[in-house]
Amino acid sequence: MTAQSPYLSFHGIGKEFPGVKALSDISFSCHAGQIHALMGENGAGKSTLLKILSGNYSPSAGEIHIQGKPVQFSNTMDALNAGVAIIYQELHLVPEMTVAENIYLGQLPHKYGMVNYSLLRYEAKLQLQHLGLDIDPDTPLKYLSIGQWQMVEIAKALARNAKIIAFDEPTSSLSAREIEQLFRVITELRSEGRIILYVSHRMEEIFALSDAITVFKDGRYVCTFDDMQQVNHESLVQAMVGRNLGNIYGYAPRPHGEDRLTLKDVKAPGVKSTISLNVKQGEIVGLFGLVGAGRSELMKGLFGATKITSGQVLLDGKPLVVNSPIDAIRQGVMLCPEDRKADGIIPVHSVRDNINISARRKSLKAGFIINNQWEADNAAQRIDALNIKTPSDEQLIMNLSGGNQQKVILGRWLSEEMKVILLDEPTRGIDVGAKHEIYHVIYELANQGIAVLFASSDLPEVLGLADRIIVMREGAVSGELLHADATEQKVLSLAMLRIPDIESAVA
């Protein structure tokens, strides 16, 4: 293998499950000392490829080569022993064990048949120092932040001398400071000659970090951009979705009616100060603020998931009393929660059940018999209207992509007489094509006169969608801007948000 030869290469990789071809003829290469991004819509095949690389799946076709030699892994330990580590969104660590024990889990040093804790602490400390971390290796993992857990996963990979480290949506649960630290570590790993495979929907991260980008679509290889000077946002999006989305937000002003939702000095658990705001019929109002600003807590209170503790909420000028989500739904107030998997869907139930779970009460025969035909027709109507990608309405919702799960939740509320919809991080973890479709649904709801209140930590999204932006800081409203007047600088100034200097972190 010459100095210019790829360290890692995929040759005709295919993967089939019963009735589904997840990957077909994937071929591309990665070089040592390279951050190589993998991009594509949900379901494009990125995670499947990582699971093949890590030994979770066996390929149905093709070969993986490392340093020019074919390799085949039967399990994740085989892959780790060959220097391949995957850092998933759901971190695979043991909370009750110490940091040191987690780093060397499966290869604890022994002396006279017993664990050598002195050597274990020493070796773990070296790995943590390598990453620039000041963490006591004797600390139980459960006391660390998610960002620190992730660093322990990286230290675990380095303890096995991993030369190939893949990250799957690594920043989805991190603070700005933790993201900055992660980028510093990733660029340091690159400088040591390691290959970094990086999967993310966040394009600003991809452009800040990557040396090359490979795009997947529908389980197939599309292209590799290996000259970052020749790729921009538009060309990358077009490669991912197979079409030019143009202005992804597609904002157009629309007439607004009377005040539909009004908050007067409202407080809820987790909201530190009183909140006053209003949303008109057909208006889209965006809530922006730091993590901890109280946006999600406010929405939970309005939906009855928690209790409004003071102040007054009005719906169409009349007091809105909500003691439970059922109360909210019956009065036309719906919520798409931030954590859709935990709070928005019933994972082991079908798409049909998840769409109909709220409206079922309206279709019961004789007050207690489920009307299967009505539910099938209603589910089919929502699946068609929202372009929900599913083999059938009987598919378990847990098997759908994040974007399609979100559309199922929206379809559930379309079955109700909606007056207000509360959207908490509506596109988090969703690919750009699905985002475009969800934005279209939001505009359609507003065009029907529904009041839309959405919270998002994606500032371009807030700027692109909202007729009006309300900025929250530490549980209080710090300012308000109209769409025409809003800029990134103005919003961040009101939020007192320190912009992470991504470029300096990766320099």
Swiss-Prot record:
SMART domains per the UniProt record, alphabetical: AAA (SM00382)
Organism (species): Pectobacterium atrosepticum (strain SCRI 1043 / ATCC BAA-672)
Record-listed E.C. numbers: 7.5.2.12
PROSITE patterns per UniProt: ABC_TRANSPORTER_1, ABC_TRANSPORTER_2, ARAG
Pfam families: ABC_tran
GO CC, alphabetical: plasma membrane
Transmembrane segments: none
Keywords: ATP-binding, Cell inner membrane, Cell membrane, Membrane, Nucleotide-binding, Repeat, Sugar transport, Translocase, Transport
Coiled coil start-end: none
Record: residues binding ATP: 40-47
Lineage of source species: Bacteria, Pseudomonadati, Pseudomonadota, Gammaproteobacteria, Enterobacterales
InterPro entries: AAA+_ATPase, ABC_carbohydrate_import_ATPase, ABC_transporter-like_ATP-bd, ABC_transporter-like_CS, P-loop_NTPase
Main location: membrane
The keyword DNA damage belongs to this UniProt entry's keyword annotation: no
Reactions the enzyme catalyzes: L-arabinose(out) + ATP + H2O = L-arabinose(in) + ADP + phosphate + H(+)
Gene from which this protein is expressed: araG
Protein name: Arabinose import ATP-binding protein AraG
